[in-house]
């Protein structure tokens, strides 16, 4: 494991591990390969790029992480100059030696294009594992009951960049607050702080129902999404957003933040499911519209489940294989 001076305790607290380099193993693998694919942009990848170039192997990459994902853990997520500097470092030392780069979303494609990345940029989703929608075709008998609690969920790691506080603040502006029961599904470094924020709404009487805060297995998340009324996604830094995509597989209507470097909003089928990032009032308005239109919400959920079929991981794999074939045909840079 590679250790970063000064920052290693913070990295450990986030639960991350960075690979170290065994040059003999790396050289053996690269000599064997027809194409060398970079999954990240760290120390191991710099060594791999240098060796692949030396051995004349074509290089490709997937853009999986924004600099802001790292910098936000250091309290520097909003330092645009620092994040741009890191991204340019990645570009100059890794990505510009690639023939092709997989961009999981349009948002990523546009960012790399605007920063003059030289590679062939290709929008290819990371893909979803196909999953059966277990939400029934017709709503249950009590679905239109004006007294029943409305389940609004947020699935995601409890960290600064996921921005659960905007969701929590939005509840103070919601006309349905007394009927809403929120569920924060996940864990992470900000779990205690976000739990306190959510519980304060309950103690202050804003919420009638006590918030549910828990970590769930994949099977449990499927059931949670299938039984929920709405799913909120506030992330300000997001390459793609697997959690919201998996929720939509269960015919759950989302309300998703749109921001400069958050790519998940592309999955919204229309503007009713998009709000301005870090704007709790706008989020509350979008939530309230959907909660006030249960029949439209149910039918729209079916369309969301159908839309996720386009992101089947098998389709993404086929597109990536074609990308590799093109890279081999073009040769190394």
PLM regions and their residue ranges:
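A conserved mid-protein helix/loop that constitutes part of the nucleotide-sugar donor-binding site
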Residues: 150-173, 189-192, 281
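Acidic anion/phosphate-binding donor-loop and adjacent secondary structure
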Residues: 128-148
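Short alpha-helical donor nucleotide-sugar binding micro-motif in glycosyltransferases
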Residues: 30, 216, 222-228
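Nucleotide-activated donor-binding/catalytic signature segment of Leloir-type glycosyltransferases, i.e.
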Residues: 192-219
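Carbohydrate-associated surface elements
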Residues: 107, 127
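Aromatic "clamp/platform" in nucleotide-sugar-dependent glycosyltransferases that forms part
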Residues: 41, 236
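Membrane-proximal helix-turn-helix segments that form the acceptor-binding/catalytic region
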Residues: 54, 66, 82-100, 115
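Conserved acidic donor-binding segment of nucleotide-sugar-dependent glycosyltransferases
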Residues: 269-280, 289-294
């Amino acid at each position: 494991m590679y250790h970063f001076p000064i920052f290693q305790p913070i990295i450990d607290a986030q639960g991350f591990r960075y690979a170290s380099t065994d040059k003999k193993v790396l050289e053996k693998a690269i000599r064997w390969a027809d194409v060398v694919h970079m999954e990240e942009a760290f120390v191991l990848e710099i060594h791999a790029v240098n060796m692949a170039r030396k051995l004349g192997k074509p290089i490709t990459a997937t853009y999986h992480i924004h600099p802001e994902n790292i910098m936000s853990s250091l309290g520097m997520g909003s330092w645009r100059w620092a994040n741009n500097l890191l991204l340019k470092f990645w570009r100059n030392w890794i990505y510009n030696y690639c023939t092709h780069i997989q961009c999981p979303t349009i948002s990523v494609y546009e960012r790399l294009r605007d920063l003059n990345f030289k590679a062939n940029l290709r929008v290819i989703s990371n893909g979803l594992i196909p999953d059966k929608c277990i939400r029934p075709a017709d709503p249950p008998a009590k679905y239109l009951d004006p007294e029943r609690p409305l389940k609004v969920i947020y699935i995601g790691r409890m960290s600064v960049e996921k921005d659960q506080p905007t969701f929590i603040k939005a509840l103070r502006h919601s006309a349905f607050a007394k009927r809403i029961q929120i569920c924060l599904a996940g864990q992470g470094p900000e779990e205690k702080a976000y739990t306190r924020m959510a519980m304060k709404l309950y103690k202050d009487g804003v919420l009638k129902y006590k918030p549910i805060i828990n970590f769930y297995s994949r099977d449990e998340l499927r059931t949670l999404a299938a039984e929920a009324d709405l799913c909120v996604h506030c992330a300000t830094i997001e390459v793609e957003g697997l959690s919201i995509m998996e929720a939509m597989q269960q015919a759950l209507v989302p309300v998703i933040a749109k921001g400069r470097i958050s790519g998940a909003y592309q999955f919204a089928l229309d503007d009713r499911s998009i709000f301005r990032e870090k704007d709790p009032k706008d989020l509350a308005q979008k939530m309230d519209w959907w909660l006030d239109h249960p029949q439209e919400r149910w039918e729209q959920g079916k369309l969301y489940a159908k839309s996720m079929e386009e992101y089947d991981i098998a389709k993404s794999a086929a597109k990536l294989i074609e990308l590799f074939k093109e890279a081999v045909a073009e040769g190394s840079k």
